[in-house]
A protein has these predicted regions:
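Charged, amphipathic alpha-helical segments and their flanking helix caps
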Residues: 1-29, 39-123
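Conserved beta-strand in the GNAT
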Residues: 36
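A solvent-exposed, acidic/Ser-Thr-rich amphipathic alpha-helical stretch
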Residues: 33
Length: 123
């Protein structure tokens, strides 16, 4: 049985261990910079004969620093921290494929936003 909340929890723990404020829902008093665990998408994996699920979790990085440096640095730290697949395991489920999907850094209304997509497969 797949438990999406356990993966979100493991990602939350990983991000907070890096020293970032991490939210599912951003409180009004949130201080920049912070990371939001955004949309979660999942589907049955194609081309597999066993019970495999592909999961994508979007991370949103928000900063009011002038320029992209802070968002770039946070994005780099997150990418480097997820190099070890074992850190994202949750319960009995086996994580066997991990990568970063579409990602971007943009300026929106004076605030810099980085968007990182974590793609992984579990069975």
């Amino acid at each position: 049985m797949i438990n999406l909340s356990s993966y979100q929890g493991a990602i939350y723990e990983k991000l907070t261990s890096l020293g970032y404020n991490v939210y599912d829902e951003v409180p009004e008093e949130a201080k920049f910079p912070y990371v939001v665990i955004g949309d979660i998408e999942f589907q049955e994996a194609q081309w597999h004969f066993e019970d495999v699920l592909d999961i994508s979790i979007n991370l949103l990085i928000w900063s009011i620093w002038e320029g992209k440096k802070e968002v770039n640095d946070i994005s780099s730290n997150i990418i480097n921290s997820f190099a070890d697949l074992e850190d994202v395991k949750a319960g009995e489920q086996s994580l066997y494929k991990f990568s970063f999907g579409n990602s971007s850094i943009k300026r929106l209304d004076g605030v810099y936003n980085g968007s990182l997509t974590l793609d992984f497969s579990v069975k």
